[in-house]
Structure formats: C-alpha cells, structure tokens
C-alpha cells in the first residue's frame, strides 16, 4: 500500500513547459514558491512569472522577466533574492539562440533588475549556490554555426555583492542538460548530461563522466563516473551527504544498436569521501525528465517523467527511496501525468509540483507540439 496522498493546489496563470530549466521552482525565504519563464506549446520562450502562496493554496501572477527565456537556470541567493541566468530566446528550432543576460528578482520590491551579462551565452546549463554566496554557472549549449550547436565546458561565477561575473576554471568535459549539486565541504558535483555531436540534439551523446568543482582553487577534478551514461536524470543530496542519481537515458543508445525505450530504472549513489558511485536497487520503472526531491523523513520522492525514446506521454506514477535500507516502494499517483515540470519542497514538508507537458509529438493535439498543463498538486507524506 502506497503512503501519502496528492491534492489539488490551484493552477498557474499560464501553461508552461520547463524543459532544461534548472531548479525551475524556487522556494523563497518567506515560504512562497517562484516560477519564472519557460516555454509555451511550441517551446516559444515566455516572460511570465508566478508565485505560489502555501497558506492560500493559490498562484498569482508576478512581475514578468525583463527578457523571455526558456532552458534557463533559477537560483535562490543567500540574501533572499533570486538569480535567473541565460536560457534560449527562440522557439523550438535549430540552433538555439542562447542568452548571456541575467536577472535578479527582489521579493521585497516584487520586481526584476539587471543581473549583468555572463561571459558566454548559454542555455541548458547548471547554476549552483556556493558556500560564500556566489553562484557557479557551468556548461550548457550555444550556437556553433548557423545550423549546428556545441556543448560548453566553460564556467563562470557571479558575485551578488558586486554584481560582477568572472570566469573560472573550465570543466574537463563539455556538457549540457546536466544536474549539479553542492557537496559537503563546499564543492560542486556535476554528473552526466548531454554533449552535442550532430545537428539534431536528439542524437547527441549521453555522458557517464562526472567531475567536481573546488571553489577555493577555481579548478575542476574528475571523479568517479556513472556505470552507464545518463541524460534527463536527477541528482538528490541525501541527509548523510551522499548523492542519489535516478533514471534518465542515453540519447545515443538507439543509434548504437542499444535502444533504451523505457528509460533507465537504475539508480546510483555517490560517496563524496571516496569519489565513487555504487549501484542501488532499481526503481519500480524507468523514467527520464522527471523530478526527485528529498522528504523531511530523509526519503527521496521521484515523480512523473516519461520514456527516453519518444517521450510522448507523462507518467502519473511516483516512487519512494529509503536510504536506510536502499529500497524502493511505489507511491501514490499524481492526478496528472507530467514531463518537464517544476517541483519544490515547502517549509512544512509538503511537495509542490506544477506545470509541465502532458503529451508531446503525435500524442499532442493537432497543430501543437506539446499539450501543456497549468495544474499544480501537493503531496503530503
């Protein structure tokens, strides 16, 4: 019998796809949740922002971004402001039109201000808060030519006090659409992701390579890699400082005669002390483009997602991982299956999921690339 339950949590002011948007939902210091930007049903970049009030259980429209964007990164700063970086400024098409701009949201003023310009325009990158309050932006995708893209190894750091961007050491491997998490002791782990190798992003190479950033030196070092390449996966930091990687798939698998139609059900656990990954029990089913959060109990809740090959329909299913025993149990299903959606843990421990795609491609309505949802749901353990 599954534990916990889902309940409706109002609707966003608009439908939104959040593909490639790192940390799309950010919980503010006052407990509200902010979602900014994203794509419409044709993956056109949007400037709309919204705030969820847990006490009212409702969403309200907030001040729009200064520049419409999708595939961007959203980071909560130590002073309570929110940093939005990069992204793509064009609709679905090839190549992307990456942005170098950044914006800062001040919850007290309820407005956005200029966050300066990065040294490199990028989308599908990671943006991680460092212990000293700065933000590390790494990797992503940019245009290579008029009809091709390339992944980036470069990284840069934003200082909220000065408002300045400075370059830092480059990663060993160029990558985009990769998750990144802060480690105990101040380092940052980036794991897996995607590397552009051809004109079509669907046939890029999935990566098993992982590396760590050291803020004290501004350098990267390679660390243990996954047992299998992953993209569209999630990283979740556990209470003991280890990191759980779940799901994803290898976009190049089909071209190498190794189709992975249902995505990876496998999970791996990273130990920062040894720099190695260990195999964990498989999830009840494979999934990519899902969300995963740590619950107040220490367990990990994995939600939604889709298969890695076509990704035509969002999953309603959820699963819970108990790190004490290394086991998975099936959780209660969401009311709406969703892909590329936002998720955040509220101050009271409930989990909010919002937006995303319900169906894509041939499974979506005629004349639309995506079937989106504006619905939100709350999970109570």
Regions found by a protein language model. Name each.
Residues 1-381:
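Kelch-like beta-propeller repeat domains
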């Amino acid at each position: 019998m599954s534990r916990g339950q889902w309940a409706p949590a109002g609707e966003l002011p608009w439908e939104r796809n959040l593909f490639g948007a790192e940390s799309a939902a950010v919980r503010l210091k006052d407990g509200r949740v902010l979602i900014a930007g994203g794509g419409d049903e044709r993956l056109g970049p949007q400037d709309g922002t919204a705030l969820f009030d847990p006490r009212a259980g409702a969403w309200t429209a907030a001040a729009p971004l200064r520049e419409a964007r999708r595939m961007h990164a959203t980071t909560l700063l130590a002073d309570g402001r929110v940093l939005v970086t990069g992204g793509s400024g064009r609709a679905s098409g090839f190549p992307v039109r990456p942005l170098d701009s950044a914006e800062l949201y001040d919850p007290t003023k309820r407005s956005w201000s200029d966050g300066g310009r990065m040294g490199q325009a990028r989308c599908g990158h990671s943006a991680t808060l460092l212990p000293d309050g700065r933000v590390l932006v790494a990797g992503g995708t940019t245009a290579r030519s008029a009809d091709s893209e390339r992944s980036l190894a470069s990284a840069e750091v934003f200082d909220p006090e000065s408002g300045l961007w400075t370059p830092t050491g480059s990663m060993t491997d160029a990558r985009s659409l990769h998750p990144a998490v802060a480690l105990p002791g101040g380092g940052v782990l980036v794991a897996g992701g995607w590397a552009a190798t051809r004109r079509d992003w669907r046939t890029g190479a999935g990566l098993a390579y992982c590396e760590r950033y050291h803020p004290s030196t501004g350098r990267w070092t390679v660390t243990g890699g996954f047992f299998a390449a992953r993209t569209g996966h999630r990283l979740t930091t556990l209470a003991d400082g280890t990191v759980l990687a779940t799901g994803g798939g290898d976009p190049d698998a089909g071209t190498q005669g190794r189709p992975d139609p249902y995505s990876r059900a496998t999970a791996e656990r990273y130990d920062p002390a040894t720099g190695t990954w260990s195999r964990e029990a498989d999830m009840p089913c494979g999934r990519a483009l899902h969300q995963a959060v740590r619950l107040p109990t220490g367990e990990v809740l994995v939600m939604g997602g889709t298969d890695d090959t076509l990704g035509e329909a969002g999953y309603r299913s959820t699963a819970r991982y108990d790190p004490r025993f290394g086991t998975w149990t099936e959780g209660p299903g969401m009311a709406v299956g969703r892909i590329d959606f936002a998720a955040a843990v509220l101050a009271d421990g409930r989990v909010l999921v919002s937006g995303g795609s319900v169906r894509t491609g041939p499974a979506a309505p005629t004349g639309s690339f995506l079937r989106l949802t504006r619905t939100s749901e709350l999970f109570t353990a």
